[in-house]
From Swiss-Prot:
Protein name per its UniProtKB record: ATP synthase protein 8
Entries under Pfam families matching the protein: ATP-synt_8
Coarse class of the protein's main subcellular location: mitochondrion
Gene designation per UniProt: MT-ATP8
A cellular component annotation (GO) from this entry: proton-transporting ATP synthase complex
UniProt keywords, alphabetically: ATP synthesis, CF(0), Hydrogen ion transport, Ion transport, Membrane, Mitochondrion, Transmembrane, Transmembrane helix, Transport
UniProt family annotation: Belongs to the ATPase protein 8 family.
Length: 55
């Protein structure tokens, strides 16, 4: 069973995770959101019922 032999795929897995952690993650963590997070309580607007003349 070739899946049990870790020689061909384990090094590729390790290198790909190192690339993700060393190159991509710092770029993503450096990103700052443009909008500030609001702590204001969000309330749903009260909607009145719509009466439809059915006759």
């Amino acid at each position: 069973m070739p899946q049990l032999d870790p020689a061909p795929w384990f090094s590729m897995l390790t290198v790909s995770w190192l690339i993700i952690f060393l190159l991509i993650m710092p770029t993503i963590l450096f990103y700052q959101p443009q909008n500030t997070i609001s702590t204001k309580q969000v309330t749903k607007p009260k909607q009145s019922t719509w009466t439809w003349p059915w006759h």
